A protein has these predicted regions:
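Short loop/edge segments at beta-strand edges and connector loops
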Residues: 321, 337-340, 377-379, 452-454, ...
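Local beta-strand N-terminus motif with an aromatic residue
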Residues: 44, 130, 197, 328, ...
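Redox-cofactor binding/interface segments in oxidoreductases and associated redox assembly factors
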Residues: 49, 134-135, 202, 356-357, ...
Length: 530
């Protein structure tokens, strides 16, 4: 309250702040008690104390960060004094009128840090002061953030083993809560039934679908919108507002409620394209009571998401694609596969509204040799991999965006190729969000040779010719060169369908080639205006 900063860690500029003094700790504890009392006055039944993830209470408990020589350092009992001071202050103020859920890292997952054994010992000290032991993991001050907030390379429930260890210790007698990329009700029930926890929590899963618990309760698990772990929700500071890739209403629920009007009559809606944007449009139009027909030229739905079936770390995208496909069927959308839409065909259907979701094409940069027989696009790479076609052992990927990085990992991790990736800019996957990018780069370092600040000057049957800003030249041997240099919207193809109905709107990649979030947002917005 005096405006001075205190910390145990070095901030982003390398500056060290003074350590907490006992009087400051006492003021902080009193502030926690004030907040608890305010919560009680507002009608809350429970509060959560965040004592994990490298935050200040976690720092005090960590032998790696707490190197104090006074009464608050050294033994676990000493390191626990500040958290206990806070819990005592809260209990003295509100008694047992509020439940306290205490969040703690079951392990910091770092050398010399807080361990699961430390966690159990601490919980033994405080279990008479709290009501729920909430077991998370990791720390912001180690390279574990992408495990603490599980990324798409990790399985669902990946951190549940820590809560299970706490439960199996038989030393903790209060309910134990686990979390970590849970969303499927069956996995939650199994975790509880096998003694892994008493409670299971979701965070991102209730952002992608706030009604997920209610849907599970009423036997509608198939309608739960699956989280794809893209972290657009957590990294919203980079965007204009809090958002979710798979639920376009998140962060703007109130505004949409004011703007959206129920349709005055049932209309005949034609959607062209069965990728995520087209399927979202068809779903929303059907939910609004319209008659919807979706035309897709391929023999399957999903668009480019279909390739997620080939890559384990894209399982979350496969889950979302399957959800959309299932909901189209459940909502009664007529789907015509292997049907290439033409203006004449669509006009004959006498639509009241047309939504074009015709996608995008790979950018083919003007590089000598780019049309050689050994050059393929990322999409063709996945198709060849699925068909088992030979691409050789040495493969070069041109482009270090998200598509290029994921394609390189697919080739290296699943097809066991020797992969080299080149990127003109200073880093790879720069458009990705911080936590998934951390996991992505970790895997690239293990499986792929990456060169940044390098451009391709030509492609020959022997491989890729490259140069850097210093004038150095080299040839990267490659049997196949994979292009991942971006996507170009099929805007012209989409415009062919304008004028066939009173309402027309292009959506998804044919407007701007972006990502799942852009696809679902534009698809939702278009259909909600019909």
């Amino acid at each position: 309250d005096d405006g001075n900063l205190v910390s145990y860690t070095v901030n982003g500029h390398g500056k060290r702040y003074p350590k907490l003094t006992k009087p400051v700790m006492e003021r902080i504890a009193a502030s926690y008690a004030d907040a608890a009392e305010a919560a009680l006055d507002c009608g809350f039944d429970m509060i959560l104390i965040h004592g994990g993830h490298g935050l200040v209470l976690s720092q005090m408990l960590s032998p790696k960060f707490n190197t104090r020589k006074d009464e608050f350092g050294g033994s676990l009992e000493n390191r626990a004094k500040f958290p206990i001071m806070i819990l005592d202050a809260i209990r003295n103020r509100v008694g047992r009128k509020l439940l306290i859920e205490y969040r703690i890292s079951g392990s910091e997952l770092t050398d010399g840090g807080f361990t699961t054994r430390d966690c159990i010992a601490f919980l033994k000290l405080v279990q008479d002061k709290i009501d729920i032991a909430h077991i998370s993991c990791g720390s912001f001050y180690s390279e574990t953030e992408h495990i603490m907030h599980p990324n798409n390379f990790l399985p669902a429930g990946c951190n549940a083993y820590l809560a299970r260890e706490v439960k199996e210790s038989k030393e903790i007698h209060i309910p134990v809560l686990t979390l970590g990329a849970f969303q499927q009700p069956e996995l939650m029930e199994q975790t509880i039934a096998t003694g892994g926890a008493d409670l299971v929590a979701m965070a991102r899963g209730t952002i992608s679908d706030a009604y997920a618990p209610d849907k599970a309760l009423h036997g509608k698990e198939d309608e739960i919108i699956p989280c794809i772990r893209c972290f657009h929700c957590r990294d919203y500071g980079r965007n204009t507002a809090f958002a979710c890739s798979v639920n376009p209403t998140v962060g703007r629920e109130y505004r949409l409620k004011l703007l959206e009007e129920p349709p005055k009559e049932k209309k005949n809606v034609v959607v062209i394209g069965g990728g995520p944007a087209g399927m979202e449009s068809a779903m929303v139009a059907a939910q609004r009571g319209h008659q919807v027909t979706l035309l897709e030229q391929a023999d399957h739905l999903g668009g480019k998401l279909i390739f997620s079936r080939q890559v384990a770390f894209k399982k979350v995208l496969e889950n979302f694609m399957d959800y959309q496909i299932h909901m189209l069927d459940k909502l009664g959308v007529e789907v015509r596969l292997s049907t290439k839409a033409t203006p004449e065909m669509v006009e004959a259907m006498e639509p009241d509204a047309v939504i074009a979701a015709v996608g995008a094409d790979a950018v083919i940069p003007p590089i000598p040799g780019i049309h050689g027989d050994n050059v393929i696009t990322a999409e063709e790479c996945y198709r060849k991999g699925l068909a088992g076609e030979d691409m050789g052992e040495n493969i070069a990927v041109l482009g270090g965006g998200l598509v290029g990085c994921e394609t390189a990992l697919y080739l290296a991790m699943y097809l066991h190729k020797n992969v080299t990736l080149i990127e003109m800019s200073r880093g790879v996957a720069m458009e990705d969000y911080s936590i998934p990018r951390q996991a992505l780069i970790e895997h690239l370092n293990e499986y792929v040779t990456c060169y940044c600040g390098v451009k391709c000057t030509g492609i020959t049957p022997e491989g890729m010719e490259v140069s850097d800003s210093y004038g150095n030249h080299a040839v990267l041997p490659a049997d196949t060169v994979v292009l991942a240099a971006g996507m170009r919207a099929r805007a012209k193809q989409a415009e062919e369908f304008r004028g066939l109905s009173l309402f027309f709107e292009p959506v998804g990649d044919c407007v701007v080639a972006k990502n799942v979030r852009g696809a679902t947002r534009s698809g939702y917005d278009a259909a909600s205006r019909i």
